[in-house]
């Protein structure tokens, strides 16, 4: 299922153009996680690899990008939406 919407302009720009100064330190990992999310047939697909550390908090799902950053999204009938890369700490 394709990503339905983004709640962060920088995350959307990285996904659509491959460019983002804000996420330059971990750009390739973030792009890989976004591509995986875009292709995911279900939220459970994001459990692999185990390093993704998929967790649900307050109605949103979180996938680990690195020690500081997470790919956060909600999952509906049409797939992932409100996708953003954030520092939850």
List where the protein language model places each region:
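Compact soluble domain cores
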Residues: 25-52
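Short secondary-structure boundary micro-motifs
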Residues: 20, 39-40, 57-58
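Alpha-helical interaction segments
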Residues: 4-5, 13, 47, 59-65
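Arg/Lys-rich, positively charged N-terminal/basic patches that mediate binding to nucleic acids
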Residues: 1-33
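Enriched for short, Lys/Arg-rich terminal
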Residues: 52-89
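Glycine-rich, flexible loop/turn motifs
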Residues: 2, 19, 42, 50-53, ...
């Amino acid at each position: 299922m394709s990503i339905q919407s983004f709640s962060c302009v920088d995350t959307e720009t990285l996904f659509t153009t491959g460019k983002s100064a804000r996420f330059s330190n971990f750009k390739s990992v973030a792009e890989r996680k976004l591509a995986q999310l875009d292709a995911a047939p279900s939220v459970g697909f994001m459990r692999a690899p185990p390093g993704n550390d998929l967790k649900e908090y307050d109605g949103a799902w979180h996938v680990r990008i690195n020690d500081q950053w997470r790919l956060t999204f909600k999952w509906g009938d049409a797939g992932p939406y409100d996708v953003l890369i954030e520092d939850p700490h």
